[in-house]
């Protein structure tokens, strides 16, 4: 069930704000509940709702406190480099929908299958989400671990993700659950070097991650990242930005994701990077 459209995250590689808008357009609670009520009439309905979501599932109902300021604002992101003070971060409408959906007699369980912004979360919402609406795996998108690369991506610092990781583990432990975080990562984003990818592999190994939800950067129209990819310049600072463009360079960066496979192919792709991952004595 798509609850809203639009995204104010402003990630430099993403086009959602271009084709859905930066302002969140949310469906009414009544509209959402009417759609869910009709599901019980489907012959294949089993009582499990796979996704109460949107582009970023936890942005439902959010908007500027003073919309006249939003109309004048030229910031590409309401979350980066810091969350805008004018952003209304009210989770009450979203939590209300979760509770009403779960109270419906034909709903056995409702999940959030869409990705969430872990840098936009209250403790109350986080606990509700993790204990009641995760089907075993929760999708999040740190995208990288390098401070400089994350700045170019307009994503929160890696430390913000680590804090959420600890919160996720704590809530699971307290609730007696064994659920997983599924982090999304990107290689070869403008500004990303082999050294940055080595750091990413080391952080993933430290957290016992085996990255699978990964992709190599693909330039898409109307994004800052694509501008940097083709020009090699950050247009905001006019500074040079390293760009991995050749197949060899891109394959090498992508190979760092698969340090855990230890295959000859994955090792060769990253130039024997497994030997460089800290704590890996087997080489």
Label each PLM-derived region with a short phrase:
Residues 17-21, 82-83, 149-150, 184-186, ...:
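Short beta-alpha connecting loops at secondary-structure transitions
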Residues 195, 205-212, 216-278:
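C-terminal accessory regions of radical SAM enzymes
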Residues 121-125, 189-206:
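Catalytic cores of alpha/beta
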Residues 1-30:
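Canonical Radical SAM [4Fe-4S] cluster-binding loop centered on the CxxxCxxC motif
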Residues 19-37, 44-50:
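Non-heme iron-sulfur electron-transfer modules
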Residues 29-33, 94, 161, 197:
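Amphipathic alpha-helical segments in well-structured domains
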Residues 38-182, 186-190:
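Conserved SAM/AdoMet-binding glycine-rich loop
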């Amino acid at each position: 069930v798509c609850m809203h459209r639009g995204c104010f995250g402003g990630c430099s590689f993403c086009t959602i704000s271009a084709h859905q808008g930066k302002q969140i357009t949310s469906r009414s609670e009544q509209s959402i509940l009417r759609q869910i009520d009709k599901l019980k009439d489907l012959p294949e309905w089993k009582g499990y709702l796979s996704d109460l979501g949107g582009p970023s599932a936890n942005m439902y109902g959010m908007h500027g406190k003073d919309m006249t300021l939003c109309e004048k604002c030229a910031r590409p992101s309401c979350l980066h480099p810091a969350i805008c003070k004018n952003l209304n971060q009210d989770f009450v409408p979203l939590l209300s929908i979760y509770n009403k959906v779960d109270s419906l007699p034909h709903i056995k369980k409702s999940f959030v299958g869409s990705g969430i912004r872990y840098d936009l979360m209250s403790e109350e919402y986080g606990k509700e989400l993790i204990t009641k609406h995760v089907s075993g795996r929760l999708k999040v998108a740190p995208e990288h671990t390098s401070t400089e690369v994350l700045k170019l991506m307009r994503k929160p610092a890696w430390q913000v993700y680590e804090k959420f990781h600890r919160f996720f583990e704590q809530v699971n432990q307290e609730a007696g659950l064994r659920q997983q975080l599924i982090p999304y990562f990107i290689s070869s984003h403008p500004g990303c070097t082999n050294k940055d990818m080595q750091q990413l592999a080391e952080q993933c190994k430290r957290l016992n991650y085996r990255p699978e939800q990964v992709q190599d950067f693909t330039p898409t129209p109307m994004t800052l990242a694509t501008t940097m990819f083709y020009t090699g310049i950050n247009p905001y600072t006019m500074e040079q930005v390293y760009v991995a463009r050749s197949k060899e360079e891109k394959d090498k960066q992508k190979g760092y994701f698969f340090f855990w496979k230890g295959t000859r192919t994955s090792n060769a792709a990253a130039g024997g990077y497994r030997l460089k991952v800290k704590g890996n004595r087997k080489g």
